[in-house]
């Protein structure tokens, strides 16, 4: 009996040791997986940030370069922001191959064809509207002024996110809205310093109003996309990001093409290319480069919304704010007076307020997530204690 009891005791100890080892291995592996996924997520975010920071300023400069050297078609500049979507088909194919198996346990169904068609149609129409308004604004405004006014999209994003995504108006966000508003107001009252031989005061005001409208359209679109990812695209995949970017650009391109032919501007394009100051080859390269830059920027923007939020994606857009005015001074010899410098400083301060608020939100979210994970381990420890007491 003593040997039998000793045998059973040794068996219980071995069983207990195996259970403890299994628990340690399971816990370490489960903690390693989220860490790996976190690294991959930040790698994707970094790529999207690079797309946004470099492609939007480049596309804006190229659009102005088209106007400065003999281009006159606002529909062409509008189309440049949209027509490059076939470039994303390759990215869509790549993301489908590399897409990891979903770990979502909600088993949510994919949106119906009718729902997807409605989403792509509505967002495409909105994209075509703000793209045309921004093309008109870029025609009548110096590129540095245009980029500074367009920075007010950050304020519009917060405004629309308040209604669509329950965005809270903290003191930092309110101060950011005020700074961005004052920054734009300085530019509208500074029309005399922007005097141009080719642009009248009325055209300047039209450009300002159109740019503000484009900024509001961008803010509405970004907030709407964030809501769609929360309520419609419940399966969070990179394919959903690229599909949205491709199909909304397809719809918007069709709308703008209809406008191009209906307005008769297409008839002037051959002579415009012949008379382009930099030559025919430069004409084609300028348009092609701008189209690709705009589409890569769109991919980065939608990707940041998918990985974080519309406010964060717009904040990253605002990081490139100083790039365009400085480049405009070098390339197009735009005036950089005291009021414009002060406007840049105010816009950057408004951007920093947004970024700091986002940092506080992320920190709070990570703290709550860590606390939740700690609570989940408590039952395991109690079960482990019960095993030891058997």
Curated annotation (Swiss-Prot):
**InterPro entries listed in its UniProt record:** PUP_plant
The Gene Ontology terms for molecular function here are: purine nucleobase transmembrane transporter activity; purine nucleoside transmembrane transporter activity
Q: How does it sit in the membrane?
A: Multi-pass membrane protein
**Transmembrane regions:** 42-62, 74-94, 110-130, 131-151, 169-189, 205-225, 244-264, 286-306, 312-332, 341-361
- Domain of life of the organism encoding this protein: Eukaryota
Query: GO CC annotations?
Result: membrane
Q: Does the keyword Manganese apply?
A: no
Q: Report the record's Gene Ontology biological process terms.
A: purine nucleobase transport
> Which keywords accompany this UniProt record?
Membrane, Transmembrane, Transmembrane helix, Transport
Q: Is the keyword Transmembrane assigned to this protein?
A: yes
Report the subcellular localization.
Answer: Membrane
Q: What is its main location?
A: membrane
Q: Which residues form a coiled coil?
A: none
What PANTHER family is this protein classified in?
OS09G0467300 PROTEIN-RELATED, PURINE PERMEASE 22-RELATED
Annotated family: Belongs to the purine permeases (TC 2.A.7.14) family.
Q: What is this protein called?
A: Probable purine permease 7
- What is the organism of origin for this protein? Arabidopsis thaliana (Mouse-ear cress)
């Amino acid at each position: 009996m003593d040997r039998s009891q000793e045998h059973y005791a040794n068996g219980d100890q071995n069983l207990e040791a195996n259970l403890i080892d299994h628990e340690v291995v399971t816990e370490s592996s489960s903690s390693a997986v989220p860490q790996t996924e976190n690294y991959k997520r930040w790698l994707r975010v970094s790529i999207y940030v690079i797309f946004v920071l470099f492609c939007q300023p480049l596309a804006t400069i190229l659009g102005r370069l088209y106007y400065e050297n003999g281009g006159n078609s606002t529909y062409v500049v509008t189309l440049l922001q949209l027509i490059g979507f076939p470039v994303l088909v390759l990215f869509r194919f790549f993301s489908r191959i590399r897409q990891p198996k979903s770990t979502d346990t909600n088993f949510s169904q994919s949106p119906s064809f009718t729902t997807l068609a409605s989403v792509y149609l509505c967002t495409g129409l909105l994209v075509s509207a703000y793209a045309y308004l921004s093309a008109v604004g870029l025609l009548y405004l110096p590129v540095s002024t245009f980029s500074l006014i367009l920075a007010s999209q950050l304020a519009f994003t917060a405004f629309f996110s308040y209604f669509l995504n329950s965005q809270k108006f903290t003191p930092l966000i309110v101060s950011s809205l005020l700074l961005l508003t004052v920054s734009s107001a300085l530019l509208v009252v500074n029309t005399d310093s922007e005097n141009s031989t080719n642009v009248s005061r009325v055209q300047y005001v039209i450009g300002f109003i159109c740019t503000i409208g484009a900024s509001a359209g961008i803010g509405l679109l970004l907030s709407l996309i964030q809501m769609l990812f929360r309520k419609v695209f419940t399966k969070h995949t990179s394919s959903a990001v690229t599909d949205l970017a491709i199909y909304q650009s397809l719809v918007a391109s069709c709308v703008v093409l209809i406008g191009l032919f209906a307005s008769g501007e297409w008839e002037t394009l051959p002579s415009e290319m012949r008379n382009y100051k930099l030559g025919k080859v430069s004409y084609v390269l300028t348009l092609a480069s701008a189209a690709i830059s705009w589409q890569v920027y769109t991919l980065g923007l939608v990707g940041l919304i998918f990985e974080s939020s519309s406010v964060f994606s717009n904040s990253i857009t605002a990081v490139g704010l100083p790039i365009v005015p400085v480049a405009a001074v070098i390339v197009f010899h735009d005036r950089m007076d005291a009021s414009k410098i002060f406007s840049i400083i105010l816009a950057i301060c408004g951007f920093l307020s947004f970024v700091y608020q986002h940092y506080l939100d992320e920190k709070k979210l990570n703290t709550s997530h860590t606390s939740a994970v700690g609570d989940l381990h408590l039952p395991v420890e109690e079960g482990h204690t019960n095993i030891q007491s058997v």
